Amino acid sequence: MVPPPSNPQQVQQFLSSALSQRGPSSVPYEESNKWLIRQHLLNLISSYPSLEPKTASFMHNDGRSVNLLQADGTIPMPFHGVTYNIPVIIWLLESYPRHPPCVYVNPTADMIIKRPHAHVTPSGLVSLPYLQNWVYPSSNLVDLVSDLSAAFARDPPLYSRRRPQPPPPSPPTVYDSSLSRPPSADQSLPRPFPPSPYGGGVSRVQVQHVHHQQQSDDAAEVFKRNAINKMVEMVHSDLVSMRRAREAEAEELLSLQAGLKRREDELNIGLKEMVEEKETLEQQLQIISMNTDILDSWVRENQGKTKNLVDLDVDNAFECGDTLSKQMLECTALDLAIEDAIYSLDKSFQDGVVPFDQYLRNVRLLSREQFFHRATGSKVRAAQMEVQVAAIAGRLHS
């Protein structure tokens, strides 16, 4: 259990540290709800300073143990004109604030839970209409504690346990002159709660030497308790130091693990890309090998024919399948030739070789001729499309 802070500034620092902590000892609340949880606890401590925020291990009914926030302390309970302090523990479960907290009455060793009670079970679990009708996000801890105080004022959940009174000794007794009457066992110490409804006899007298003996016993008990508290504080300080050191080591190891995991992912991605690239290159190599074999076969087949092509006219190197294809080839060749001529004229004009008026006249003539060749090519292309459509229709009908 983490010790509670002692002042408002430490309360804020404690809550900020607890809600932002990472690792095995972190609290399991949703990130979107942590700010509202912090505000609820700050408002609660501001309204009821007797409550203190802590973190502790909570055991569920199924055996699961989780580290949760709690508000531990006392809440005021007015009863018959006197204000009593009821010790409670308010656990903020994992689903808080969307679901209500878990409230327990936490009786001390000299207290007992009233049985039966309308709102408190024998184990100390509190059940109130406010908890059953919890509405997110309007419900909060301040209103819950106010409702608890009012419900307990109507029906106190705790009674003080009666202590056994030792029998008085047989020697003559001397009464304390400062008291108006011999004090009883119930009057020797103030009770913070209503008396127990259960029976039990009490002594009506108290001897003087017993009174002094109790004072010496109380002093020894106080010394013993202070020594135990000092040892507990020392052990707790050592445990806190060890826990912080272990948490720092755990955070460092978690950071190292995250870095290694990130590098592993990068290596896996790189390896996958290399495997895919290797497969692609193997496919391309196979295609290139097939094309190389085809070219080698073509070269071997046509190697003897090159001797007959020495006196071949370049214009007759390509034979067209029909008249339209031959006309289309001529139009395209003339169009491209004129395009080259215009480009040469532009180059010559930029270099200052051709005068401006001659440049414009030649470009105008060439452009007009190019237009006619392109128009003829468009008509030939349309005629080829008609022939192809007719051929396809003939094959379909046949």
Swiss-Prot record:
Keywords: Coiled coil, Endosome, Protein transport, Transport, Ubl conjugation. Residues 18-162 form the UEV domain. Ubiquitinated by SINAT1, SINAT2, SINAT3 and SINAT4 for subsequent proteasomal degradation. Disruption phenotype: Clustered trichomes and multinucleated cells. InterPro entries: ESCRT-I_UEV_domain, ESCRT_assembly_dom, SB_dom, UBQ-conjugating_enzyme/RWD, UEV_N. It is found in: Early endosome; Late endosome; Prevacuolar compartment. It comes from the Eukaryota. Its main location: other. The keyword Transmembrane helix does not apply. Gene3D superfamilies: 6.10.140.820, Ubiquitin Conjugating Enzyme. GO terms for biological process: cell division; protein modification process; protein transport; trichome branching. Component of the ESCRT-I complex (endosomal sorting complex required for transport I), a regulator of vesicular trafficking process. Required for the sorting of endocytic ubiquitinated cargos into multivesicular bodies (MVBs). May control nuclear division through the microtubule cytoskeleton. Belongs to the ubiquitin-conjugating enzyme family. UEV subfamily. This is Protein ELC.
